[in-house]
From Swiss-Prot:
Reactions catalysed according to its record: S-sulfanyl-L-cysteinyl-[protein] + uridine(34) in tRNA + AH2 + ATP = 2-thiouridine(34) in tRNA + L-cysteinyl-[protein] + A + AMP + diphosphate + H(+)
Ranges that cross the membrane: none
Reported function: Catalyzes the 2-thiolation of uridine at the wobble position (U34) of tRNA, leading to the formation of s(2)U34.
CDD domains (alphabetical): MnmA_TRMU-like (cd01998)
UniProt-listed Enzyme Commission number(s): 2.8.1.13
Disulfide topology: 101-198
Catalytic machinery residues: 101, 198
The protein's name in its UniProt record: tRNA-specific 2-thiouridylase MnmA
Enzyme class of the recorded protein, top EC level: transferase
One Pfam family linked to the record: tRNA_Me_trans_C
Site (Interaction with tRNA) location in chain: 126, 338
Localisation: Cytoplasm
Gene: mnmA
Location of region: Interaction with tRNA: 148-150, 305-306
Length: 376
């Protein structure tokens, strides 16, 4: 076909990217499958399934009759994602490597590789939409299946990138994607979705982290200064955490409500809705906008963690690359290192990395509004 466009599909060995490749071929594109390896199996002690994943890619590509290749970005990933991930933990943050991977690997060096192969577009199996709306430029829009929507992880995509990428399953429900895979007898039709962080696999997170972040025991302490147990290091705990604290006694469950990384203290209190877990403002840095930054002050919706219900907020000002944000309702466990992502309805505007939550309701001696919702 003389004017046939070429699409490189980023294939992970899962059902979403498999169906993405199929749909691109059905739509008349010249399709190339490209598998990306980001982590060395020798580091995984045999746990990582990358060999099986690539075998599934090969079988799918053979089945739908498209060529496929593998690329090795292990060194890129280690330098640009994993090193930052560990550095953030070492300073007491709780980072999100998926966001960094999308920015530095999938939609940077992987996209560059696709273009090298002669692609007009890169397609991935993400649940989001790339739509031309009223302004005539691409918009990053939530996937039809809001339960699977992945725009939270993709807020760093900009106009230039959006002009080069396609999201074939973004307009489908997950159940429809599996139905298509079954109908076309793809080997990945019933394959379980991957969860967690790729370089950790099924292993215990703490045991993995301990290989890279020193165990520095300290005290679990209440906000009144009472020691109630010992922890293995502030890096191993995150705000709002309940499981794995090992604090006994009567009464309600214990939760992490704060950390003093310099002094090696993890602050804990009892009760899922303790006021020390809530704040209604934050400062975000490392800002990224899909189009242009909004005129301020700007009221919109946001998420401070994946799958959170959208929360109304106002971006008041941006100074020295930092956004000062307040919320209409108290937010639970706003965590440094995670991202706040901004929306207008289903349109993703951009976001930034949470640097500092505001003072808690406990700090301000404020009561939580009646029936404050668990919004996580």
């Amino acid at each position: 076909m003389k004017n046939q466009k070429t699409v490189v599909v980023g294939m992970s060995g899962g059902v979403d990217s498999s169906v993405s490749a199929l749909l691109m071929k059905e739509q008349g594109y010249n399709v190339i499958g490209l598998f990306m390896k980001n982590w060395e199996e020798k580091d995984e002690n045999g746990v990582c399934s990358s060999a099986q994943d690539y075998d599934d890619v090969r079988r799918v590509c053979d089945h739908i009759n498209i060529p496929y290749y593998a690329v090795n970005f292990v060194e890129n990933y280690r330098k640009q994602v994993f090193t930052q991930f560990i550095a953030d933990f070492q300073k007491g943050w709780t980072p999100n490597p998926d966001i960094l991977c999308n920015r530095e690997i999938k939609f940077k060096v992987f996209l560059e590789k696709a273009l090298e192969l002669g692609a007009d577009f890169l397609a991935t199996g993400h649940y989001c939409q790339n739509l031309i709306l009223d302004k005539g430029s691409p918009s990053l829009v939530k996937g039809i299946d809001h339960n699977k929507d992945q725009t939270y992880f993709l807020y760093t995509l900009n106009q230039q990138i959006l002009q080069q990428v396609l999201f074939p399953v973004g307009g489908l429900e997950k159940s429809q994607v599996r139905d298509i895979a079954r109908k076309h007898q793809l080997v990945t039709a019933e394959k379980k979705d991957s969860t967690g962080i790729c370089f950790i696999g099924e292993r215990d997170f703490r045991s993995f982290l301990s290989q890279y972040v020193a165990i520095q025991p300290g005290a679990f302490q209440t906000l009144q200064g009472k020691n109630v147990g010992k922890h293995m290091g502030t890096a191993y705990y995150t705000l709002g955490q309940r499981k794995g604290l090992g604090i006994g006694g009567a009464g309600e469950a214990w939760f992490v409500v704060g950390k003093d990384h310099e002094r090696g203290i993890v602050f804990v209190e009892q009760g899922a809705n303790h006021p020390a877990l809530y704040c209604d403002e934050l400062i975000a840095t490392d800002l990224s906008w899909v189009a242009e930054a909004p005129l301020l002050p700007y009221t919109c919706q946001s998420k401070v963690r994946y799958r959170q219900n959208d929360q109304f907020c106002t971006i008041h000002r941006i100074e020295n690359g930092k956004a000062f944000v307040t919320f209409d309702r108290p937010q639970r466990a706003v965590t440094p290192g995670q991202s706040i992502v901004f929306y207008v309805g289903n349109i993703c505007l951009g976001g930034g990395v949470i640097q500092q939550p505001g003072p808690t309701y406990y700090d301000q001696k404020k009561s939580l509004p009646h029936q404050s919702p668990r919004n996580d």
